[in-house]
């Protein structure tokens, strides 16, 4: 019970961390409003990190990490995926999905995630606009955000990539192996988060960059609960990103 209380307290601490983020609205070509938090570097900087949340949470999971990055002189931007957090509106809301049948929900889900690559690209472009032509950007994807990180890195000069409790399909692992194995890669997974852990091992074995890291945890915690159970994890992620985002 005491351990549970400590974990809950740590979660609340993370989620209530005072943030100096600028709250943004990024508008797509179709006029859809995406909400994001921009953590502006406290100094002139040509480094940035795009933070993509997991599908059972929203961009606030990165409040602490985003602020720490900014304090290190690195621009950071966390995006609420369309249909999540403050980017849920119109046909893309939890209430709308709950009203659908199982079959309808599957179709609606595929329609929703089809928008995400362009939505993430819009966020990347905004972050890139805050830097010179020599700017370098990393991307971290938690859980479902990992596949979006792969797509973004395939199509843009992303320097660093991270998979935070992000299980990948065989197809996505092949995409990583084809185009991204030379990039510094941070991989975080719990041993009993079965499919995710197996995927993480495959990605780590595939990486050819000597700076790639695999952080393994006991248990089955998935994504942001790891930030609560290990209060040093956020700082480690920030330090690793800082060390790898170099020209």
Where are these regions (language model features)?
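Sec-dependent signal peptide recognition
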Residues: 2-10
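Serine-hydrolase catalytic machinery in alpha/beta-hydrolase-like enzymes
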Residues: 26-130
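Primarily recognizes the serine-hydrolase "nucleophile elbow" in alpha/beta-hydrolase
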Residues: 122-181
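Short alpha-helix in the alpha/beta-hydrolase fold that links the catalytic acid
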Residues: 174-176, 192-206
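Catalytic histidine-centered segment of alpha/beta-hydrolase-like enzymes
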Residues: 220-230
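Catalytic active-site module of serine/aspartate enzymes centered on a nucleophile-bearing elbow/loop
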Residues: 229-247
